[in-house]
Amino acid sequence: MKINSSNNTATPRITIKSLAATLGVSHTTVSNAWNNPEKLSPELREHILRYASEIGFQGPDKLARALRTGNANTIGVIFNDSMSYVFIDPHDIALMRGIASRCEAQDVNLALIPLRKPQQTGTAPLTALVDGYILNATHNSADVIQQILARGQRVVTLDFQFPGYSSVSIDNAGAMHDIAHYLLGKGHRRFGIIAFASQANVLGMRSLREPITGDNTLMLTRVNACRDAFLANNVNVERCWLYETRHDEEHGETAAQALLTAHPDITALICLSDRFAVGAIRYCHRAGLAVPEQVAVTGFDNLAVEVNGVGLTTIAQNAECKGEIAVELLLSIGPVTHHELPRQLVIRESA
């Protein structure tokens, strides 16, 4: 389609300055109609807004205002996986529901910032215009995280702690001790653990002979808590195995197959999430391994109650409440606070 440029007359751009000139008031008065309404009489503000609406002016440029004042009225949520992950993972769906509900109540916007971007190569600068960040169990050495810390912006961490910043978490080590001691009490001595990666791109199987290291504090806390419980009960950790993988049911199934094929003496699979546990039970069902008679399986989060007709033994936590408190801490001016939420070992048929 060809546009006739002779008829393409540009409409003059409406600004606060031009609006003020038309109304015969100051630039500041017009600005206050949107940004500081308490400084104007209701009648004057209504007069300005009504005229602005009549001529199609929606108000000051929010981006320009954010750049000028340093206040974007937006918080960023950073997580390890791709953007679509938070709309698929049950834990993160509940977490984001809590975050979003508090943002709505405070009239604050949200920006979702994934650390894993499939098309990205090299180091990308952090360009999001936000007032502060919620870090959702992130890899701490990621370039984006280091940029945030270097800028000194407001931060609240979820399921791990940074010195000088507020956090929200359950006692993850205590939760894993609960699971480990429960399984030990059932007589298990050969364990496999299915976990998300200890650091970016570290995947596969390894022994628990040595403490696990990396930069995903949540994963390290949970796995090493299990290892500590095993050692305290004279379990041979050289015959206990860890499988690190991508976080979903399919990879949980693959991990269970790899662990039980390579080490058929394993009698209990400890999964760091219910999603992993779903996959593990699916594999056991497919391989003809009775759960829990031949292989016990535990999860984490209490979001998958039953798999293949088997109730899942797991740790219950309130992810939605975690998100709500994170926003409250981020928007508050109070001192650094570490908020610990309750957790519960929920015993069902799988272990």
Question: Where would I find each of the regions flagged by the language model?
Answer:
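N-terminal helix-turn-helix/winged-helix DNA-binding helices
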Residues: 2-14, 53-87, 106
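Periplasmic-binding protein-like
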Residues: 130-136, 192-194, 242, 263-273, ...
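Append "Primarily bacterial transcriptional regulators
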Residues: 19-20, 48, 295, 345
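Hinge/beta->alpha junction and helix N-cap segments in small-molecule ligand-binding domains
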Residues: 81-94, 113-118, 168-178, 193-231, ...
